[in-house]
Every structure is written in structure tokens, then in C-alpha cells.
């Protein structure tokens, strides 16, 4: 029988921006304290029925992925602090766009996919035990395939693009 892959073997890293006079760079911090990070592919379909056929045909013509998230707020976590700043500042456009890297930890070489997302604030403060935030990340560009490495036991990572 083949081995099942645990959810904890697919890690998410969020690009926290550092602004300088000349450019914005990102440090990719591990997304900790998240109760949920789930992707909906949201396929775009083209359906039609031809007059000479008794059935409808459907083709998938694109995708609009959305990543839903929820996290318990931890003080001093750079990912939480950045997302909370987007929520509280009701940021829009480029000010609310961040790169995210998904890293597959199951192999020797850590394959990774990097993509830009708009951070969409949805709710905060639910529950009585922990202060929580929830929202979604909506796609802002193509997938970039590569590998990830880390020098600090996967608290942060570095992404290297590979040619497909």
C-alpha cells in the first residue's frame, strides 16, 4: 500500500515585505498558527449542446483559485502582523498583494510553487478562546515552479525558480 501524505508535509510560506528606497523585497516566513489553509480551484467552464447531440458538453477553460485561511493571532508573528495590518488598514491593490510559496516536504528536493495573491479580509474576532482572523487569498498571477531551501529549520525559506 502507498503511504498517505500528512497535511503537515505541505508547508506554506508568506512573503512579508521589507521596503527600501529602491525596491520591495520579501522574506518568506512559515505560516504558523493557521487552523485552515484550503484551496478551491474554481474552474471556469464553457458548456454547450450541439443540435445533433442529445447531451451537453463541458470544457474547463480556466481556473480562479482561492485559498481560504483562518488563524489564531499570535503576538510577534511577522505573518500575522502583516495580514492584520492589511485587515486593519483596509488595504487595497498592490498594498494588499503578497507572494506565497507552497513547499512539498515529502521529497529530498523540496518542490515548491510560488504565486502572488490578493489578501482579502473577511472576518475577525470569532470564538471566545482565541482572537481569530479569517479571509481568502485570491490569485494575482501565474504559478512559478521551483524548489525551496532553508537555513533555519524551515522557519523561513528561499525560492529558486526552475524551468519546466
PLM regions with names:
Residues 86-92, 119-123, 137-138, 155-159:
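Short, low-complexity, polar/charged sequence segments that are solvent-exposed and flexible
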Residues 138-164:
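Protruding loop/beta-arch "assembly-hinge" segments enriched in small, turn-prone residues
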Amino acid at each position: 500500500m502507498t503511504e498517505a501524505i500528512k497535511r503537515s508535509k505541505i508547508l506554506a510560506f508568506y512573503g512579508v515585505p521589507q521596503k527600501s528606497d529602491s525596491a520591495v523585497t520579501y522574506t518568506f516566513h512559515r505560516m504558523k498558527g493557521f487552523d485552515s489553509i484550503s484551496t478551491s480551484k474554481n474552474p471556469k467552464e464553457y458548456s454547450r449542446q450541439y443540435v445533433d447531440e442529445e447531451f451537453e458538453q463541458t470544457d474547463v477553460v480556466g481556473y480562479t483559485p482561492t485559498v481560504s485561511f483562518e488563524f489564531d493571532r499570535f503576538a510577534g508573528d511577522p505573518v500575522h502582523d502583516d495580514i492584520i495590518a492589511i485587515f486593519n488598514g483596509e488595504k487595497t491593490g498592490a498594498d494588499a498583494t503578497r507572494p506565497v510559496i507552497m513547499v512539498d516536504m515529502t521529497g529530498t528536493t523540496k518542490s515548491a510553487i510560488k504565486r502572488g495573491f490578493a489578501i482579502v479580509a473577511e472576518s475577525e474576532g470569532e470564538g471566545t478562546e482565541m482572537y481569530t482572523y479569517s479571509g481568502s487569498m485570491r490569485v494575482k498571477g501565474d504559478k512559478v515552479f521551483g524548489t525551496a531551501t532553508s537555513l533555519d529549520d524551515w522557519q523561513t525559506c528561499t525560492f529558486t525558480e526552475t524551468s519546466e
